[in-house]
Regions:
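N-terminal interaction/assembly modules
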Residues: 1-125, 129-132, 136-175
């Protein structure tokens, strides 16, 4: 599983929690259950491969991090979505932005540009294509407010980095 797929899986978990209200740890453990997980591969290709141990740690971290800071993350979204009430933004798009903001603020190993690019990709995939511009505008404004450089990252660089991560993860699991 690539880091991008792990991020997409995190969005699924965060979004699912919007409806169940379950504790973050339970959401992750239930979805990754050895009996249940294989059934999900028929629903979405991101479930074709099981996440590595490092990716499970990532999922635990971001799902609980977003859950524990949801109000603050929504306040940030509200502040930068000028002219929009945060409750008018689809839950899924809001979850995508919550994850990206959490990564920007708390995940030092995730470059700001990657967090934003991935959020735009996921928003376009799961919402309307024009949602990508909306998400990009909000997250870009937020990043600029932090004086965080939003580096230009090409799709090729992202894919190359994900392939390297996948190779490193496999090598680490073999040790």
């Amino acid at each position: 599983m690539t880091r991008g797929n792990a991020r997409e899986l995190a969005v699924h978990l965060i979004y699912g929690r919007e409806f169940t209200g379950e504790e973050p740890e339970k959401v992750v453990s239930t979805r990754l259950d050895k009996e249940y997980y294989p059934q999900l591969s028929t629903e979405n290709e991101i479930y074709a491969d099981r996440p590595s141990k490092a990716q499970v740690r990532y999922l635990d971290t971001v799902v609980s991090g977003v859950a524990n800071r949801q109000d603050a993350l929504n306040e940030i979204i509200q502040k930068f979505s000028i002219g929009w009430d945060v409750t008018r933004i689809s839950k899924l798009t809001r979850c995508v932005m919550q994850l990206a903001i959490y990564e920007i603020l708390h995940m030092e190993d995730v470059p700001t540009g990657v967090a934003i690019s991935e959020a735009v990709r996921l928003a376009k995939k799961y919402d309307a294509p024009e949602t990508g511009s909306f998400v990009n505008g909000i997250l870009g404004s937020f990043a600029r407010s932090l004086n965080t450089p939003v580096e230009e990252v090409s799709a090729e660089e992202i894919l190359s980095a994900e392939e390297e991560e996948a190779v490193e993860a496999v090598a680490a699991e073999e040790i």
